[in-house]
């Protein structure tokens, strides 16, 4: 246990140590003067700060922070904080009007040791100390808190301000001043008289660079041009833009220099390129930047001020928010305002319309409509939903008549109709020959699977579109080298393809014979498959599709054949009468049953029920 004598000796030692410790002088002091605190204007103002009509007294706390943001008072006060003394005791008088409350005497002073930032945030709290018969002593409670951000240069005059917190109103003044030997708007330059002795002891280096500018200006190098040169240290000569040389008397030749900025080059006499203080335009809110010999200067537009035009002097009373924006704050020119924009607008003053449709929120080709308060999508047919995200079934509840098939797509149903029917729902009778598809006078015949053209003499093709002998020459391919025009092998196909076609013909013939179950079809099939020489497959000869020619090559009998009127066949059918080999040609589907057998000794004509090659076997 420490004795009273030892305790007193320890206290004296601590006090002496604190006295003789080296004290760091502050760069400056922020001073706050409270003028009045009381009920604000308007209805509902309180009559007394004291609760239950007990006596109370007020005191104030200030917290300073650098930067542009107003922060909570509980966070660290980077620039410092101060607490005032207690004010006079106040007791409410019944029936008396609410007066301004008695305030503590003196200033609230916040010393700062670093450079003054220029732009700062403040939080001022008003506390109430109740002096009734509380158990445990007085009780403290927060009565009001105001905050703001300001632009303030050190060394300037007092600035006045009014802030309201709920029903209370606070009027105050503030300033920032430098403590000698610090000078300047940021208290960063040190100044001492020329005759002042050194602050440091013998053999010690200077504590900080001192500038002799209190009594006399700096003395530059002898002969330094006063118009084109300047100095920041005694005995130097630094040139302004466009001038060079030891004394800044030589103009820079712009014809051979890359940039008129930076230190001069001893070899070329030009200025070496370097970054400038206005590069990137440090001035905000549309301010214009101009370089000075030592830094830059911003010329701010109307309504803004500050070193970089970062502080707005416009208040909510000026109506700065457009398009129905709500203005908050900005009670005086030194406080900032904030615009809360309605949906569809953005910007510091709600001056920019948000193009929400540029994000293409509507799917499946829907049309985006920005109504300001809401976004709407106009969907294409066949789609639904807030963003047209649902694909509707176009064929639901819709049927196509007469065997038609519903095809979905394009936001509407479409019917693919069977042959002979048309219209939206296949309810209308349609004639495939109504459009006259057969060219050059050909006759059109309707069929259950399509249409067939009977061509006029001299034309051929599915639609009679090809002349048989254009300009006196055959329209069929020319004979291969080494073959004569009349040679039966003139249009001979490759052997492998011929075998493949022959096998296909035989299989198709057997299948048709079995399906139709005609008694004479077996004999015809036997004659086709038995006793027939190795067939060869050829391209069509000149006698093709409506060409009259003479058949008789080989050992068979010669007869005149009319290709427009085949024997023993309905005139609507189209056939190819064979030579001693198998010929192939793509033609339209015939009109009648798939097999026709002629009389004994005559040729058999094989007709297929689907679009295919019409073949005949001798």
Swiss-Prot record:
Domain notes: The DSL domain is required for binding to the Notch receptor.
Recorded superkingdom: Eukaryota
UniProt keyword list: Developmental protein, Differentiation, Disease variant, Disulfide bond, Dwarfism, EGF-like domain, Membrane, Notch signaling pathway, Repeat, Signal, Transmembrane, Transmembrane helix, Ubl conjugation
Ranges of residues in domain DSL: 176-215
Lineage of the species this protein comes from: Eukaryota, Metazoa, Chordata, Craniata, Vertebrata
Occurrences of domain EGF-like (ranges): 216-249, 274-310, 312-351, 353-389, 391-427, 429-465
Protein name, UniProt field: Delta-like protein 3
Region (Disordered) location: 546-566
Biased composition (Polar residues): 546-562
Designated gene of the protein: DLL3
């Amino acid at each position: 246990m420490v004795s009273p004598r030892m305790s007193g000796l320890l206290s004296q030692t601590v006090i002496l140590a604190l006295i003789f410790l080296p004290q760091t002088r502050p760069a400056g002091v922020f001073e706050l003067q409270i003028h009045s605190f009381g009920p604000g204007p308007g209805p509902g103002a309180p009559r007394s700060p004291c609760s239950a009509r007990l006596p109370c007294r007020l005191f104030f706390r200030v917290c300073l922070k650098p930067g542009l943001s107003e922060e909570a008072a509980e966070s660290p006060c980077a620039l410092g904080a101060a607490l005032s003394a207690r004010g006079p005791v106040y007791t409410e008088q019944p029936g008396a009007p609410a007066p301004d409350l008695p305030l503590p005497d003196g200033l609230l002073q916040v010393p700062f040791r670093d450079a003054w930032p220029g732009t700062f945030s403040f939080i001022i709290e008003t506390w109430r100390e109740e002096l009734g018969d509380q158990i445990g002593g007085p009780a403290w409670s927060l009565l009001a808190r105001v905050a703001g951000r300001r632009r303030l240069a050190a060394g300037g005059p007092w600035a006045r301000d009014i802030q309201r917190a709920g029903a209370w109103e606070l009027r105050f003044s503030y300033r920032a001043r430098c403590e000698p030997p610090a000078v300047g708007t940021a208290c960063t330059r040190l100044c001492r008289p020329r005759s002042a002795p050194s602050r440091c002891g013998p053999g010690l280096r200077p504590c900080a660079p001192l500038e002799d500018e209190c009594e006399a200006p700096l003395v530059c190098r002898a002969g330094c041009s006063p118009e084109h040169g300047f100095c920041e240290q005694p005995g130097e000569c630094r040139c302004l833009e466009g001038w060079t040389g030891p004394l800044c008397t030589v103009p820079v030749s712009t014809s051979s220099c890359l940039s008129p900025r930076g230190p001069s080059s001893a070899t070329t006499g030009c200025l070496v390129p370097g970054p400038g203080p206005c590069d990137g335009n440090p001035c905000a809110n549309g301010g214009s930047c101009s370089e000075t010999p030592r830094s830059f200067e911003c010329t701010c537009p109307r309504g803004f001020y500050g070193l970089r035009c970062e502080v707005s002097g416009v208040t909510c009373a000026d109506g700065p928010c457009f398009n129905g924006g709500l203005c908050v704050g900005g009670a005086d020119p030194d406080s900032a305002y904030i615009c809360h924009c309605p949906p569809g607008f953005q910007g510091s003053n709600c001056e920019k319309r948000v193009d929400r449709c540029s994000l293409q929120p509507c799917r499946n080709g829907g049309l985006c409509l920005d109504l300001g308060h809401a976004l709407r999508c106009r969907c294409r047919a066949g789609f639904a939903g807030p963003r047209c995200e649902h694909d509707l079934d176009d064929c639901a509840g819709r049927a196509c008549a007469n065997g038609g098939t519903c095809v979905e797509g394009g936001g509407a149903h479409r019917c693919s109709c069977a042959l002979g029917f048309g219209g939206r729902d296949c309810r209308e009778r349609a004639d495939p020959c109504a459009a006259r598809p057969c060219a050059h006078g050909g006759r059109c015949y309707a069929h259950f699977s399509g249409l067939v053209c009977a061509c006029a003499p001299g034309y051929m093709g599915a639609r009679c579109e090809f002349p048989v002998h254009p300009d006196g020459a055959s329209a069929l391919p020319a004979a291969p080298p080494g073959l004569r025009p009349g040679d039966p092998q003139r249009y001979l196909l490759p052997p492998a393809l011929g075998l493949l076609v022959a096998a296909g013909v035989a299989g198709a013939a057997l299948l048709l014979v079995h399906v139709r179950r005609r008694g004479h079809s077996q004999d015809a099939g036997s004659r086709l498959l038995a006793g027939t020489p190795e067939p060869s497959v050829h391209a069509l000869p000149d006698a093709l599709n409506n060409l009259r020619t003479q058949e008789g090559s080989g050992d068979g009998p010669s007869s005149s054949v009319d290709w427009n009127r085949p024997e023993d066949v309905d005139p609507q059918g189209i056939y190819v009468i064979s030579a001693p080999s198998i010929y192939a040609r793509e033609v339209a589907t015939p009109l009648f049953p798939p097999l026709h057998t002629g009389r004994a000794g005559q040729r058999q004509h094989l007709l297929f029920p689907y679009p295919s090659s019409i073949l005949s076997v001798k």
